[in-house]
Amino acid sequence: MTSAMKKIQPEAFSEKSSDSQASVSGAKSSSFYIGMRVLPPAEREAMYAIYNFCRQVDDIADDLEGSQEERKQALDAWRHDINALYAGEPCGQAAFLKEPVARFHLRQEDFIAVIDGMAMDLKGPIVFPDEATLDLYCDRVASAVGRLSVYVFGMDPNIGESLAYHLGRALQLTNILRDIDEDAEIGRCYLPREPLEKAGIPLDIEKALADPRLDKVCRDLAWQAEGHYAASDHIIHNRPKGYLIAPRLMAAAYSALLRKMLAQGWKNPRKKVKHNKLALLWTLLRLKVTS
């Protein structure tokens, strides 16, 4: 489990056959797809391009059939092409980002941060990171994507970056809590080390996931995510300038998912919670009426 943006769309969509769309896949019924559809064309295409980039580098990190060196080289190639793009040089696979970068003044360091986040997964399965490492990971694979997005949404940079900070972490923590068992199957566990040790839970994936004390650790992490959702809601409810339906929908959809998990708990055996598609559409209609 890596980028929040990738996790937000599990199925396939395709708007057209342009380079920026060629490898994009997502869900026509997902919160990402629904949220992006309400944007004006230029903003929508820019978001699809950002997603395309995220999807490609995320797939490199998740390609468990490729060797570590092959995947490292692939991420290094992306890093080279992003740097070339901003230097005005031939930029290879990053060429589809030229227009959104120029139009919306997207920052080089945010693209690089996403790549660096994928590289964290590449160094070996992330297992029980310390809290500082987990926060850095969330910043790179989720909040950095948010920082790119808020420029497309036309938000004030300071307000937008604050929204990206909180909403990115909220979404990523929600994904981590949702995908505990799925991640464990590939030898990963993103739950932070310190609360597990404090609870006396062994730092062994199989033992930790079967431990009844895990429920409280997960609930505490869920409340951290709730705090980030609350901070995001506070920013959005102040009605800053920009196209806010997309982040509002993401926040509404994923905070609802988190509430479902809190109601269900994390005691073994766990049942993975999913989005309610009709509820997503209803939320979109409600947000359009109140925007």
Swiss-Prot record:
Residues 1-23 are annotated as: Disordered. Pfam families: SQS_PSY. Belongs to the phytoene/squalene synthase family. HpnD subfamily. CDD domains: Trans_IPPS_HH. The gene is hpnD. It is an enzyme of class 2 (transferase). GO terms for molecular function: geranylgeranyl diphosphate synthase activity; squalene synthase [NAD(P)H] activity. It catalyses: 2 (2E,6E)-farnesyl diphosphate = presqualene diphosphate + diphosphate. Disulfide bonds: none annotated. One of its GO terms (biological process) is carotenoid biosynthetic process. NCBIfam families: HpnD. The keyword Transferase applies. Involved in the biosynthesis of the hopanoid precursor squalene (SQ) from farnesyl diphosphate (FPP). Catalyzes the first step, the formation of presqualene diphosphate (PSPP) from two molecules of FPP. Pathway: Secondary metabolite biosynthesis; hopanoid biosynthesis. This is Presqualene diphosphate synthase.
